């Protein structure tokens, strides 16, 4: 820092109030649906690399007693003619992970769901309202839930609605 002639105190003051933008590895303790659970909000963007990374990162979260690892995924958009193939390629990564259940919403992410192991399959939702209405039944106390998808799918707003029950940021 000294070589670059940077003032550490000034830098510290700049970063003290830094908050990760919504939908980008935003980890929250949530109290909603009469349950307490952890939400990892990755809902702002999705491409093949970020989706694979987010899925693999779920393996690094230490599982607590009676905790399930759930993911809710939506489409990766703007992939063109390779969209189905790229969505399908996520399934083996999920199948090798310690994720318990996968829930999906969207046209292309069904390709992922169709290639999942039977024990990993949660549910395909027709729309986000249906998903929101069912989440109270799906979520258990202490669950770890990651939400990941392209912003244009509306998943970011879905995540914001869940966070309205937020206790505090982890």
Describe the function of each predicted region.
Residues 1-170:
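ATP-dependent carboxylate-amine ligase
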């Amino acid at each position: 820092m000294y070589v670059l002639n940077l003032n550490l105190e000034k830098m510290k003051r700049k970063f003290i109030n830094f908050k990760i933008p919504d939908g980008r590895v935003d980890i929250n303790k949530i109290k909603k649906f009469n349950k307490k659970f952890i939400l990892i909000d990755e809902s702002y963007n999705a491409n093949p690399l970020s989706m694979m990374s987010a899925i693999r990162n779920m393996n690094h979260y230490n599982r607590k007693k009676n905790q399930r690892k759930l993911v809710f995924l939506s489409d990766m958009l703007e992939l063109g003619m390779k969209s189905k193939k790229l969505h399908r390629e996520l399934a083996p990564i999920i199948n090798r992970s310690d994720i318990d259940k996968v829930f999906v919403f969207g046209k292309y992410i069904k390709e992922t769901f169709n290639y999942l192991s039977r024990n990993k399959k949660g549910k395909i939702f027709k729309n986000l309202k249906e998903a929101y209405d069912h989440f109270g039944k799906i979520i258990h106390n202490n669950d770890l839930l990651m939400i990941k998808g392209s912003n244009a799918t509306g998943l970011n707003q879905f995540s914001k609605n869940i966070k309205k029950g937020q206790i505090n940021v982890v």
